Each structure stands twice: as C-alpha cells, then as structure tokens.
Amino acid sequence: MPNRRGSRNAYYFFVQEKIPELRRRGLPVARVADAIPYCSADWALLREEEKEKYSEMAREWKAAQGKDAGPWEKQKPVSTPLRRPAMLVPKQNVSPPDMSCLSLKSDQALLGGIFYFLNIFSHGELPPHCEQRFLPCEIGCVKYSLQEGIMADFHSFINPGEIPRGFRFHCQAASDSSHKIPISHFESGHDQATVLQNLYRFIRPNSGKWPPIYCKSDDRARVNWCLKYMAKSSEITQDLELVTVEDLVVGIYQQKFLKEPSKTWVRSLLDVAMWDYSSNTRCKWHEENDILFCALAVCRKIAYCISNSLATLLGIQLTEAHVPLQDYETSNSVTPKMVVLDAGRYQKLRVESSGFSHFSSSNQEQRSNTPTGDYPSGVKISGQSSSVRGRGITRLLESISNSSSNIHKFSTCESSLSPYMSQKDGYKSFSSLS
C-alpha cells in the first residue's frame, strides 16, 4: 500500500496560507497540523471558485512530485475536528459582485458609485468547539466613492459581553497582541444592539435595496459571524450582503479595463504599510495610545489604496479625502539618516497636559463626533475638521524641519559677528569689544 502521509490537498495549502495571520493573533501555531483546528470555519465559508485556487496548488505539487493528479475532484480537508451540527458556521452564500449594476461603461457612473468598507475586531478567536467563536469589540465603516473619496465614516467600540469561562487569558492575550482594547471595564464600549442599529442607519439607502458591504477576504468570516451574532440582540435585523473587496477591485479592472488581475496582486495592493501612521487614519483612542491595529484604520486604508491605484487610470484628482496628502509633503521635506523615537515620553507629556485619561477623552470624542442631524452615534462626515495628527515619524519630521530652520538662523547670526573675530587669537570675548 503506498504511503499517503505526504499527500497534500487543497485544505493543506489553505491552512499553510493562514498560518502567518494566526501567528499575528497570538495563537500557538508552529506547523500546519497546529493550525488546522483554527481554519475549518474559514474554509467552510469559501466558495467553490475560491477553493479551486488551492486545488490547483495541490495539483501542481503532485505533478512536481511525479504523481498523477487525475481528474479534478472536490478536495476535502484532512484532520478537521468534528463538531455538533448546531456549532457549525453556516456557509455564506455570497456571489461575486454584479458590476453591471454600476454601468461601468459610463465613467461618471463608476466615479459616482458609493461603496461601504466594513471591519469588526474581536478579542481573539475561540477554538472551533466553542459555540461563541468571536467577541466583537470594535467596528469601523467607511462610505467611499472614487470621485469624492471618503465621504463619511462610522466607528464605535462594542461591549463584548460576558467572557466565556476559561478563555479570559486567551482573549486578553489576543487583545494585547493586536488592538489592545480592554476586555472589561472599558467606558467607551456600547451595547451590541445599539451599535448594530447605528450601523444600519449609517448605510441605509434612501430608496431601493441595500448596497453590498465590502471587507477583506481574510476578515470576512469574522465580520460575517459578528454581524449575525450582534443581530440576535437587536430588534431590527437586516441581511447585509457581505462581499470581499478583492472581488470589487477585480470587477472594476475587468469591466473597465478589460483585464482581470490576479487575487494575489490585489491582496498585495491592499496589504501595504505606507498608510499605517498617516493622519486621521486611526480612531482617536488608538491614535492617542499609539496603537497600530484599528478597525476604522483598516477601512480607511482600503479607500487609500484603491484611490492610489485607480487615480491615474481614471483621471481622478486626489484630495485629502482620497489619501492623506499632507503626510506626503512633510515626508518629502527632510530625509534623516537615523530616526530615534521616544513615544513613551510624548505619551506621558500628552497625559499630563490633558489632565484626563484616555478613556474619558474617547468618550468626549464620541460626543463631539456625533452630528446633530439624523446620523447615529459614531458617524463623522468627512467635511468636519479634525485635530488628530499622525504620530511618530510625521511629527518627528516636522520637528527636524523646524530645527533645520533654526540652524539656518544661527548660521546667519554667526556670519554677522565675523568682523569681530581675530585672525590671530581666533576669537575675542564680547567684554573686550566694549
């Protein structure tokens, strides 16, 4: 009997691709076998055409090993832990976005189309045998168009509810390794029903059917689960159509430019770090605490990347609503050879000068950012001014620029004193000049 221990199928390559993400969450994943229990739910949410990518990888591997892959057949995951039927995550019936409804033959219709980018953060991911897989703690949503850029955004912290017994340390460790949102006694957290209703009010169309909501493919399983979980505690439920933003970008290129980019290229387009410390990207709480992971920042960076990619192709004039242009101007003024950051000192100074904690300042943000119209709590219109600036490298570059101007003034002053300098002694004291 041939040895089949070395056989690799589509699920093997899917798990192998998910390992870096699992490690970022703080999960103890050293090899593929360790990651298998954490990937079964995400695998179940994939469509058949998405699984075909990993099936092709398996066939290529078998061909390289001198094996005959044979006719294509559906690959089944190996070593997938069994769960009760009630605990299975329902398979999401999501089809690729229907780009024909946007009438992409008309440039004006494409530029004026409205898109919503959504992301929900959780206090880690519980094992597959748990009925509650995620604990939602933060939500961010952005209203975007290619013509106007970011038109409005919605952000709110979520009260995750009771932590499942025995998983408090697991959830705390996952939070500390990413968004660092406290798992309990967080004053800025709102109940799940209120947050979901405010989200519905933010994306509710004036007429017609509800628009599709876009998120990254790596986050779709978590976002979809959290939406359904939060809907259980809300009186008003709406079955939102959740589509991957990768499909949106592929659809735009395919319909408008008659070419279809690969999903790998699109993912590399969206997963960039150049916007991580840009101004007005993160929420105020994450900005003040100098924390990189933020649900609102994920949505905003999607808009930045799409604007940056399609601006020249569609003739879009970039504005502050498309990308943070002021950071470009600042970063191009000075190019230091070495950068030393002391974020702790600046953090201490900001706390002492403000006179209140980060939690109370976040509450003030919630109140100050709430418009007086029909917009729900957490909604901010792009036209409103904001005092939040980028931390770290942006402020350092500005200080270096100011220091350069001061050095120039000093050199001018030194030149004016040159007649008083003695060639023999090299200098004279100012007292001797009198």
Curated annotation (Swiss-Prot):
- Pfam name, any one: Maelstrom
Q: Name one GO cellular component term.
A: cytoplasm
Which GO terms are recorded in the biological process aspect for this UniProt protein? cell differentiation; male meiotic nuclear division; negative regulation of DNA-templated transcription; piRNA processing; regulation of miRNA-mediated gene silencing; regulatory ncRNA-mediated gene silencing; spermatogenesis
Write out the ranges of the annotated region (Disordered).
Answer: 357-387
Protein name (database record):
Protein maelstrom homolog
Q: Which gene encodes it?
A: MAEL
Taking the first listed entry, what is the main subcellular location of this protein, grouped into a coarse class?
cytoplasm
Q: Where is the composition biased (Polar residues)?
A: 363-372
Sorted keywords for this record are: Cytoplasm, Developmental protein, Differentiation, DNA-binding, Meiosis, Nucleus, RNA-mediated gene silencing, Spermatogenesis
Return the similarity comment: Belongs to the maelstrom family.
Residue numbers of the DNA-binding region are 4-73
What is the role of the protein in this entry? Plays a central role during spermatogenesis by repressing transposable elements and preventing their mobilization, which is essential for the germline integrity. Acts via the piRNA metabolic process, which mediates the repression of transposable elements during meiosis by forming complexes composed of piRNAs and Piwi proteins and governs the methylation and subsequent repression of transposons. Its association with piP-bodies suggests a participation in the secondary piRNAs metabolic process. Required for the localization of germ-cell factors to the meiotic nuage.
Q: Give disulfide pairs as residue numbers.
A: none
* Domain of life of the native organism: Eukaryota
Q: Where in the cell is it found?
A: Cytoplasm; Nucleus
Natural source organism: Sus scrofa (Pig)
Subunit and interaction comment: Interacts with SMARCB1, SIN3B and DDX4. Interacts with piRNA-associated proteins TDRD1, PIWIL1 and PIWIL2. Interacts with TEX19.
Statement: the UniProt record of this protein carries the keyword DNA-binding: yes
Q: Which residues cross the membrane?
A: none
